[in-house]
Amino acid sequence: MLSRRIIPCLDVNAGRVVKGVRFQQLRDAGDPVACARAYDAQGADELIFLDITASSDERKIMHDVVAATAEQCFMPLTVGGGLRTVADIETMLKAGADKVSLNTAAIKNPQLIADAAERFGVQCIVVAIDAKREPDGQSWRVYTHGGRNPTELDAIAWARRAVELGAGEILLTSMDRDGTGDGYDLELTRGVSDAVSVPVIASGGAGTLQHLADVLDQGHASAVLAASIFHFGTYTIAQAKAFLGQRGVPVRS
């Protein structure tokens, strides 16, 4: 069985790492370069850097901050937020990113996924999906622009389509659970994981180490993303790996 990855996420707003609850009430969590250095030292498997207001502000991602973060980061780095063209993606890869995360732009122009995958390889292309449970409780709607704008897309159907177009990985965030510490949306994660043939990174809701184990087991996720529990010192990466390892989850040492 492939090792399960533990991935801290840097949500960056105006050059600072922030963390909110359900995409609101942002708290400052530090300098992105310092955070990247710390997570590298702690042994994180990968790092995700998301410029969370680049799409809603209709501006480019902060190249200099990404480049400085990549310099301190010797694990795989995924960068997302405000990437709209193949040229934007190339700029980020040249700045030091190993993978790029596409969200709003991929929904506006799904061909971008195919074009980027053809140019850089599917292993480079992560499609991020921000999903909120519908009132019927049985489905999840996709949102864009940092969770601000609802679409007509169903999360599971969109994940399937994104993979058909060339996504090599899905970054799946439950907007209902984001920052709550109440645990991941296991139903949503399992629904998407079982629908696609590529790895799914579960995001939104980690509050305890048991939550990580639950979404890997019951949610069928390939990797877990967490922010609050690592940024604010509740747990370390090493503690997370030890906890999972003791429960028979294969993790990288």
Swiss-Prot record:
GO annotation, biological process: L-histidine biosynthetic process
Top-level taxonomic group: Bacteria
Xref: Pfam families: His_biosynth
Enzyme Commission code(s) on record: 4.3.2.10
Catalytic activity, reaction form: 5-[(5-phospho-1-deoxy-D-ribulos-1-ylimino)methylamino]-1-(5-phospho-beta-D-ribosyl)imidazole-4-carboxamide + L-glutamine = D-erythro-1-(imidazol-4-yl)glycerol 3-phosphate + 5-amino-1-(5-phospho-beta-D-ribosyl)imidazole-4-carboxamide + L-glutamate + H(+)
Protein localization: Cytoplasm
Similarity field: Belongs to the HisA/HisF family.
Protein name: Imidazole glycerol phosphate synthase subunit HisF
Organism: Opitutus terrae (strain DSM 11246 / JCM 15787 / PB90-1)
